[in-house]
A protein has these predicted regions:
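Domain-level signal for soluble alpha/beta catalytic cores
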Residues: 1-278
């Protein structure tokens, strides 16, 4: 359905078990944290796909399914609320601050009662990180910052991680990670991350290209069209095995990282391997 992607599974009850089973597959592989399926439930995506009237339901169901998975697993995991960029992914949101704040608050207010902390999910500018952090603080929730870093080790806004931390640091931050970035970019940026005086780490993706962006064809589908699979638009690294992911993660942990995980194209077997590093 257009650009709705994973949020379709929250909307249609026949797919709820898919979300539940996916959460459980990661929990049973050793994940300490699962993230609500709200990345594609941002309002702009629902407007584009003509389902904005279901905004509350789609976001609520994502949270309820995460809680159901936790309860079924009987494991003491945490639930992070995915609070994504409120426009396109991987690029800076250049709108006025009050417009960005309203969108963050609308989504965060629905998610907040169900979660342990907010995960700022792949944000691309200090301004967005600051606005989202202030929204989460108003809702009395801790925050894990997920900053998307490019090959030049800058955010899409042109800021360094150091600049973002120095200008916008919030007392409710649990830490800061490189979000949805390749293992190679993690390795390039890790020396700067280790100097920010916060818990740090990564959620690495296994896309074939280093710098994904909304210009790729998968994000242009109309509401009544089937979009290109991101695996085709971005490619995937089938040969990046769980063992390679373990070796990469071990190297980053030795640099001081304490928050590690997988993003797009990482699978339960990748998490199972890195869970051995606890």
């Amino acid at each position: 359905m257009g650009t709705l992607w994973s949020a379709s599974a929250n909307l249609e009850k026949k797919f709820h078990n898919l979300v539940l089973e996916l959460h459980l597959s990661y929990i049973n592989s050793g994940a300490d944290v699962i993230i609500t399926n709200t990345f594609s439930a941002r309002r702009i995506r629902l407007i584009q796909n003509k389902v904005n009237e279901h905004f509350k339901y789609i976001n609520e169901q994502a949270c309820l399914l995460a809680i159901k998975a936790k309860n079924q697993s009987k494991k003491n995991i945490l639930i992070a609320g995915s609070l994504p960029s409120q426009r396109d992914t991987y690029v800076e949101d250049k709108r006025k601050s009050n417009e960005i704040e309203k969108d963050f608050l609308d989504q965060a207010s629905i998610i907040s009662p169900y979660i342990d902390f907010f995960y700022l999910d792949v944000l691309s500018s200090g301004k967005e990180i600051d606005i989202a952090s202030n929204v989460a603080t108003k809702l009395n929730k801790p925050i894990l910052v997920g900053a998307h870093i490019k090959k030049n080790c800058l955010l899409a806004s042109g800021e360094t991680i150091t600049e973002v931390v120095e200008k916008y640091r919030n007392e409710n931050w649990l830490g800061l990670i490189g979000a949805c970035i390749s293992p190679e970019i993690v390795e390039k940026s890790i020396d700067e991350l280790r100097e920010i005086n916060l818990p740090f780490g990564f959620k690495a993706n296994l896309w074939k290209i280093d710098e994904p962006g909304p210009q790729q064809t998968f994000n242009t589908a109309k509401f009544n069209e089937v979009g290109t699979n991101p695996n085709i638009a971005f490619g995937k690294r089938d040969k990046y095995t769980a063992k390679l992911f373990y070796e990469f993660s071990e190297k980053i942990i030795k640099k001081g990282a304490t928050i590690i995980g997988g993003c797009c194209e990482t699978k339960p077997e990748h998490i199972r391997e890195i869970s051995k590093l606890k």
